[in-house]
């Protein structure tokens, strides 16, 4: 009996400290920290990483719900969760909500996590913007509690953030779930992205490899419920949002023909002659060997503002670079021949070519 108890004790001790092995992890985030290099908040662990001289710093996050909003501003840092569905980082922020400084967050700052460094990896966790979009969506315009600007970002890959790797991560939101900013490069593998209105958007280069892109219904009836992408890719940038061997699916209550594959976003910028829709934004989205479910009806137009503050429309056929190739499923090739990528262009469409290297393997 004594030998058995000793073995059990050793086994328990082994399982207790296995995840905190310094050879594997540099810091541990847990709801119950009780030792050196253990923290209750992810932001505390990131500060430890910033103070460290270690180049590749790994933060392991135990299962739990972490109500935090933060920037990842340390190069070569990894945030690794214990499990994708039970390690949850969440925050309630929408564009029209008031921040602690008494101002509206705005879309770009409504994020839960924003990557502002190079060579950052997120792995095995969920990033959720917990703003109650469905409840807000059904409120009338004269309801004083209604948030008029309901964009709520879960993850933002910031301007100039290079070589971000997002692996086995769920991004949970509704409108504007994922923002990939200009001059950023990111690789998503075996990820799930949920949303409805323009829920993958921005001017960065991003590859979605074997991902599940899930459309969510609106809580009030409408013919068009949303759009998968809204790229603002610079005209001199060859690629924008590229989906490879992925599934573009839906939740059970999403009707057929209710979602656009994407629409061209021309964000307003300030120029020498005024502020208006960026003429150099020619959004790029490609679906390569993807499954397209029946909720998709093709590409759509999007509006912007001209120099005289008049609304103008950008056409998916002429003001964007929207293509698919080798699609399967009910909505395959529904957008027409002009949006089928050529065989020559398809041969060049490797992950290495799009991302400019093999760094995503490391």
Predicted regions and their residues:
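Sequence-level preference for short, compositionally simple segments enriched
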Residues: 21-362
